[in-house]
Amino acid sequence: MKKQILSIGLSLAFFGQIFAQTVTNHPESSYKFEQIANHDATPVLSQGMSGTCWSFSALSFFESEIMRLKKEQIVLSEMYIVRHAYYEKAVKYIRMDGKTNFGEGGAFHDIPYIIKRYGIVPAGEYTGLRPNEESINHSEMFNVLNGFMGGVLKTAHDLRRGESLSDSWKAGISGILDAYLGAVPKNFTHNGKSYTPQSFAEYLKLNMDDYVSITS
């Protein structure tokens, strides 16, 4: 067992040295590499213990677009997107009688949809972190949301013909999301000017209809 651990440790050290090296044009190589274009990007952020890579990756793209179009570096709130996406997924889940997926995952096209419908805010205005929480962890939140939605779906199935669900469950799902992620801001200040999420989206001058998501 000790030999195996030592072997793994040496392997990690070896590969660590390889990947830590600076990549340059080798003096004796016939290949010459030259940077002809550079696309600015915001710093890479951690999604913590959450299934929200789709929000982080898509917003990183739009942050680069803001730098290209407005020459301004703005980090957008991934959790603002996640908060509204969960609500929209919950509504669709009940409307489709539980035949759609209610999970942590998402895709690029969710971001333009949410921004067009709800606007967007800077990351500092909505972190999605509770007091004294330093990193993202959605394990408990998702279990609570999943259990709640299971109860709503069962109630819908138990209704008699002609009966329908009240809208109170929607306030319930919003309450859970607010408890874990925080209430979304209605107004905030950016560079000395007051914005709503919708007016801030307009300020960014990103036309969501200009972007198309393609997958293979």
Predicted regions span which residues?
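Flexible propeptides and autoinhibitory/regulatory segments associated with cysteine proteases
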Residues: 20-216
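Bacterial Sec-dependent N-terminal signal peptides
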Residues: 1-23
